[in-house]
Amino acid sequence: VEARANAKAELSDVFSGRGICCMVRRPMSNDDSLRACGNPRNPCNPRTSHNSPGRVLFASLVGTTIEFFDFYIYATAAVLVFPKLFFPAGDAASATLQSLATFALAFFARPVGSAVFGHFGDRVGRKATLVAALLTMGLSTVLIGALPTYDAIGFAAPLLLALCRFGQGLGLGGEWGGAVLLATENAPPGKQAWYGMFPQLGAPLGFICSTGIFLLLTELLTDTQFFVWGWRVPFLASALLVFVGLYVRLRLTETPAFQRAIENNERVRLPVLTVVTEYPGTLVLGTLAATATFVLFYLMTVFSLSWGTTALGYPRRTFLILQMIGVVFFGLTIPLSALMADRRGNRTVLIGATLAIIVFGFVLAPLFGSGNTWGVLCYLALGLALMGLTYGPLGTALAELFPTSVRYTGASLTFNLAGIVGASLAPYAATWLAGRYGLSAVGYYVVGAGSVTAAALFALRQRESAPSQSADLRIS
């Protein structure tokens, strides 16, 4: 019955001239090709079936889980593997710092990915761009697993490693914003934060999977086997996860908000230029509002793993287990913060979590520096729980700052510029501060980052969308 009704409507469009007017009156433009002149199979056509909530949430979750899995296996390898295999020329401390420098490179690639993928996400559509971002990230990760080491090709090895890391950053720069929009632009009223937290859950899930596979490998393999070939397994195995993500995302249709943007001809020619020229204040404040989130997370993961297994003398396996326990608290507080955000507002929850992060900075050194297992576990659990409280509503809060026409670009840029400011140098800077001034200096680093973010959140007044987008995302 539905098929006959659609066919009848299409014939009516054709005979009335609406279905072919764009081809008769003028050549087909990019906008016309997206409208497809009433093609009922076009995902942008309003007569198409909508995505089911379960499919949307699973697609937004599975993609970010894969992307963060790929991202974190590099972070773990940058501490445990790459200093020995790709930077063996200097002492252990110098090799670790050089390895962490390649880790930081991806954060500078992420805004580039935001601009490139954001352009197509705001011009062509969310679905196709998400598929391209996933492929970029997946290919870069698999190539890392196939790289020869320094002993085989010399200085070319770290250069190729850095190039692949840059590719990872490009892919993740385009992934996060699209996944958040896929969820929030399909969300019913009053549940934007709840839907928006599903892509955020990809971070703890990806971390648990990446840490779990390294733990399994260290349990099954000898150190020699692990450093000869075992470390490559997580990178190569990510290809299977990418295929799963592609299968799920290729079955989606376009989001309702982007469909309306096409129908109302609201797309802009250069989204990144529009964001920079028309929303500069929003871009800067949004970036600073997300900075403490990045600083905290990469101190709790990359820096803590490095310092715990060197200065504190923890065995690699033991510390990875402690981190996995801490990440469980991260995963539990993400949905909790999303529920609170839908009731109290995103900004209120983010301000409360940021103030708690500032307090945490003062207890960082006593807890982590004690060396006591319970103290270290308390440090990891508390820090990562606070991370979940600030991370849960962050995606929705950043997406709400921009209208549909530039939302993919705007939200992605703010998030990934915050990655440069907050995360790119955080492990490097914390390692240097701890080595020279002690862990108290790292705690003050957290206090400073939290203070900047709190000031930005107080200054940032969430903006209502333009009237033409009043049915799209609502400010909590």
Task: Locate predicted features.
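Helix-to-loop junctions at the C-terminal end of transmembrane segments
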Residues: S114-G125, I334-G345
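Cytoplasmic membrane-interface "Motif A"-like loop-to-helix N-cap segments
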Residues: R123-L134, R343-T354
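Glycine-rich segments within core transmembrane alpha-helices of 12-TM secondary carriers
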Residues: W194-T218, F415-A426
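A membrane-interface helix-boundary motif in multi-pass transporters
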Residues: E219-L236, A430-G448
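Multi-pass alpha-helical transporter architecture, strongest
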Residues: G245-L250, A449-S476
